[in-house]
Amino acid sequence: MVNFNQFLKQAQSMQKKMQEAQEQMANARYTGKAGGGLVEIIITGKGEVAKISIDESLLKSEEKEMLEDLIKVAFNDAKQKCDEDSQNSLSGALNGMSLPPGFKMPF
């Protein structure tokens, strides 16, 4: 059986690692590109759009629909990178944490 004091120390360590991972994620930036770089979106680790860059060649009215699609693709690309990094950071924070039998984390 796991010593309760040892478990509490592990939980405190995990909490600290989780806070560090969350701070790291909040400061991270992820770039999504579409159309070979014609559209570029940078998002924060919180999934908020920080910047959008659009090549001038796409600013013609006949390119409107394509531009809308490229913005969507670029955002989804950046969001996927953010989600993957977030998952990896949180997994790393939990690494080495041994939980007592039957104890489940809420995520």
Swiss-Prot record:
Pfam families: YbaB_DNA_bd
Assigned GO CC terms: bacterial nucleoid; cytosol
Main location: cytoplasm
Keyword check for Cytoplasm: yes
Compartments where found: Cytoplasm, Nucleoid
Keywords: Cytoplasm, DNA-binding
GO molecular function ontology, one term from the record: DNA binding
InterPro entries the record matches: YbaB-like_sf, YbaB/EbfC
Subunit field text: Homodimer.
Similarity field: Belongs to the YbaB/EbfC family.
Function description: Binds to DNA and alters its conformation. May be involved in regulation of gene expression, nucleoid organization and DNA protection.
The name this protein goes by in its record: Nucleoid-associated protein A1C_06705
